[in-house]
């Protein structure tokens, strides 16, 4: 709603003060429109220059959400003063200045104040362009390090800080050392690992800190000595005339009523003007009575001494000089900076004291001595003495006619061409003479050893010996004293050989193969384990045609256990079936073709032998042991000892043999009983028996005993006549029960029937695939026997 008025616009200060927070100001009119309250708003539109309020102009009423900005009072004082906006430009300038104070601008003439609205931006741009803008603000002072030209007060403050910091650092390092130095409760800290390098570093750091504190006190004493009054100015009572007192800061003696010179009551004996101090010393701050006053330097020294006494436990006073502060740090500083003065010339020596010939001759001696030590191989003591003598001769020769000559006979680098003297010594001749003298010395050196070797050679019936040769080395290696007449001669020759080798430093290498005698391993084995056959020889019997001796050894393994009173002996592992004829009990064949049960009996001859573990005793020893085992399986200790002495065995070996034989006899008896029971049960159930045939060698003949040969053909024919099918037993997982061979005289008493093995050829014709199955079984048995031998 728009309102018009013809009255003049009047500003009411009271209304402005009361309505400072509102966006509108009430104005009074003449009252022609009664009952209606006319409200008018004074607006200042930015961007319009010289806008004036006329009574005939219409002013629209706007809400409080309008973006038009008006002047408002910020405080009560401003509200009390009349605000008469005579010009819009002045109002805007005040707003701009107010913003300038709240947020200072950078002194950039191109930047202007910008508002959030476009109208405000236009108003500010026009005002600044007209020249009525805000003046640039002053540069803000940077906060950082103080200027380099510091005052004495700053120096004292830095000394305080430095001393306190270095003391704290030193206490830290001392605590580290004390932590490892103490033994702890009940000495437990002694077990800790000590960081030696770190502790050494801490000790060095402590000395460095002490030296820094000492340096700080030295600087402080130097500041205390500046402007100090001479002691001659003081009388015997310690008083000084006022005319002689001057200011230590400015050096002036002028004194005014408000700028008097005050003497320090410390140790510096200096005076200062009141206004020369920083900060100035006012009259009311001067101590009254007997109370003393200290200058800033003395005050700083007292503070540093108090901190030092508190943290380090020392007893220093203000009267002590800086040299008494940590005197042990002086040695550290001197040790790090001192130079070995032994290599330097004396102070009173001149330049002509230096003799270049001595230094050059010293270098030549070193080079020559090192060359002779590496090439000739003489003793170090003799070579050094000879080198020193030769060097002295060279020095005397080279220093002729006031010039220096090196080893090659050439003049020194600083000499001219005219210095050559044709009458001088010839260097080539000198070198030849020296080489000849060296050779003569060497020959003299080795003459004694040569004579000694010649005498030894004559005593041994040999030619003269000059040194260790390759032929002598070979004869010494190959012969064990056989080339000499007797043992004393051999010892003397070896002694001479060692002495000649020791006397010569370098022995030329021999360009030939090393003469090493081949070792007889069989002899060594026989010495260590006796003359019995070794395991390496037994391994050969697994492949190829075996000899009758090897077969007898395998047969003897079972025969040694077959003669036990229990009637047999069994193996806990698989038996070596290759050299035996196996009889298998009948098997239950399932519909699926798997073998449910398998038992094996091995028929063996009654030949002499031993078990796999006891085979190294020999057949004679095993025969005697088996005879005693038949008589008494549990012999007494005395019997065992007698057997051990008689057979040349130890008591433990005899005891182990009897225990193992008893064990395997019990196992064999158990297996035999189980086989008989199974055989009876299978016969009652009308099961078929199967005989597995093992082919041996190229002739496919299995030899059970030398005297008793069983043919496979008869057994196979009998089995065919009986109507029992033959099958090859391919199962190798079960153990083989070894049964004793039944002799003709015991056939009537033995309940078990003898099974004769037929010939392999007829069996192959009757049973297909028999050869392959027996080959697989043979390999499995070989593997088991290898395990038994290696596990021994």
From Swiss-Prot:
InterPro entries: HD (IPR001356), Homeodomain-like_sf (IPR009057), PRHA-like_PHD-finger (IPR045876), Zinc_finger_PHD-type_CS (IPR019786), Znf_FYVE_PHD (IPR011011), Znf_PHD (IPR001965), Znf_PHD-finger (IPR019787), Znf_RING/FYVE/PHD (IPR013083). Residues 345-354, 373-389, 433-453 have a biased composition (Acidic residues). CDD domains: homeodomain (cd00086), PHD_PRHA_like (cd15504). The keyword S-adenosyl-L-methionine does not apply. Residues 610-669 bind DNA. It is found in: Nucleus. Residues 116-127, 362-371, 774-792 have a biased composition (Basic and acidic residues). Keywords: DNA-binding, Gibberellin signaling pathway, Homeobox, Metal-binding, Nucleus, Repressor, Transcription, Transcription regulation, Zinc, Zinc-finger. Its main location: nucleus. Induction: Induced by gibberellin. It comes from the Eukaryota. Transcriptional repressor involved in the regulation of gibberrelin (GA) signaling. Binds to the 5'-GATC-3' motif of HD16/EL1 promoter. Functions as a positive regulator of GA signaling by suppressing the expression of HD16/EL1, a negative regulator of GA signaling. Plants over-expressing HAZ1 show increased length of the uppermost internode and panicle, due to enhanced gibberellin signaling. Belongs to the PHD-associated homeobox family. This is Homeobox protein HAZ1. It comes from Oryza sativa subsp. japonica.
